[in-house]
Amino acid sequence: MDMPFCPPLEPQANTRIAFRPGDSLFSSQGQAFHGRGSLLQATPREAVGACAAQLLAQATEQQAEAGATPVLLGLLPYDPAGPAPARLQIPRVLRRITAPTVTLPAHHATILQRREHPDQAGYEHSVQAALARLNRNDGLRKLVLARTLELDLDRPLDLDDVLTRLWQASPHGYTYAIPLSDSGQDYFLGASPELLVRREGRRVRVHPLAGTAARHPDTTEDARIAQALLDSPKDRLEHAVVVEAIEAALRPLCCTLDIPAQPSLTSTARLWHLGTLIEGELADPAISALDLAIALHPTPAVCGLPTADARPAIAALEPFERGYFAGAVGWCDANGDGAWAVAIRCAQVHGPHLTLSAGAGIVPGSVPTLEYRETGNKLRTILDALGLH
């Protein structure tokens, strides 16, 4: 029987991922875990960390003779109390691959229908309501408001093509695909630029992104936009709130924690972001990467601050259930090492039907029209990879 373990790296030059319905994928640092089949799986609604530890312990026992280190792939919902459960899986077969360099032909799927939820007027109205709430000065400091774009296509997507395009377009990001059913037709997939947490031994790394501007094809104008983002009081405030919350969550868990005093610029093909690379050392080596992801999630980059007040405020303003959007996706092995990304730049796929989601951080000084535009720029990342316009 093929058993999951940390296998040797397989170069993928001029080849495809060979992703099949039912497979799973998570890429990080130029490599990806590609899982096929399921040795063990669970969909817990509570005690997710304990459930994952139990699955890994069972897999380790089964692989004792081989001396292998099992790897778990997982997806956490935005709201643990919501209708979507966590999804944890130890694949029956696991490959470790590099990004394919194959050149793919143009994608020819046609959009038959598109629906914004809410539309531009509705979204901007929600931003105005969020600003009114923030201006009450009742302790709420930031809200992240999202919207969805539903697409009906003339044919189902070729997931192997889509994931190849996503990975090639975001080589330094986190491309992922997690099945949502046994049919192979339902997926949550995307390419996140944002590292929620990485654990290697006792070393911890977190790289939150908050504060965004669209890039420009002219290099001079692009540089001006980047500098303006770095100098923006509104975006600096939005980012500082996120860093503050992450520090509060990590400080009790780490014996050392290094947090730069100022954010730096991070770019994708379409966007500039403010980012802060936070590094630390765990006080307790028993804390796993998944434990850290659960402790940090959701950060104010996707929810707000304070979380306990922001979550119900968002639920009152957003006319849809987020599900796995703004959740967390990644991997953890039996040693506790792993990497988890914020589940953004994403789509939920059901055959030829797609639901894309994107959000923007709202703080005092936010402009509704600009926030709507920001969500559109974020949606464009996934639309480009899908070859849809």
Sequence positions of predicted segments:
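Glycine-rich, N-terminal phosphate-binding loop and its surrounding beta-alpha-beta segment
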Residues: H34-I90
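N-terminal leader/targeting segments and the immediate start of mature chains
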Residues: A129-A130, L134-N135
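Conserved hydrophobic core element of enzyme catalytic domains
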Residues: L277-H389
